[in-house]
Amino acid sequence: MRQDAIYARQSVERADSLSIDGQLIRCRFEAAADAREYIDRGFSGKNTNRPAFQRMMDAVRAGEIGRVIVYRLDRVSRSILDFARMMEVFEAQRVEFLSATEHFDTAQPMGRAMLNICIVFAQLERETIQARVLDTY
């Protein structure tokens, strides 16, 4: 029997961002009781070079995971290319992807399109933040 996986990420502790604990609490409402939790603290979503994310993907490739649950899409990736690669692996392994706060029916063409539109805006937000940081120096 394949398990659910919950993935949570927070790049920095800020008062205006949802904590890892907050993400986990919301995702647990969607997950089976025995869900595995993968947590990356202090890692950006600009790429997938994150220890817990890589462990989760290894479990997906091994056929151990049947569903991945995130609080919000941008917690898993802020890169169009990385997100597309992840979704290809999920599709090949028949893994369902679920955002606990955004409702996309990825079984339907419109749901898949909306998912891709959201990841475009997640990448745009990351690049805008990077530009602002560079402007301050």
Regions found by a protein language model. Give the residues of each.
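Short, structured surface patches at the beginning of a domain
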Residues: 1-136
